[in-house]
């Protein structure tokens, strides 16, 4: 009996600790969101400048600098809508890695700014990374989209744990046509109900 009482107390204490940790993390996320709060117009300007190969001051930038600014854009985009960034975005060249918590689920994020479609090898590597996690889910962002063959190869006969995002999904967000949460909800719903991981979100603006 005494053992059961101690176990219950320990469990309650652990639960309280987890709740306190969650509260601290949420407060930190809210503080970060307020610190980097940015308007839609500012996000649009940043994104358009990146397409022109320039920073906000109109200065020409190289691929590594563009990757860094794209990382900043994504971080602001997520935090601005109160989406918890659970793993800081890391950048290697034009590749960005991190993770978010959305609608109670953790998603691994990978983003690339290449001058052409993302090919099959990149998607396969990311899919393997997602599948290696318990209940893993992923969001792969490729500014210039994905080749039809690579999307088909990834979805044929496989468990769908990844959704794909490109600039055609991001630009309308910066135009205020719909927000990031609406875009993610739409893509997740279509993936879960129709088995399609790469869909056009512009119908949300209708």
Predicted segments with their positions:
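Mixed-charge (Asp/Glu-Lys/Arg
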Residues: 1-206
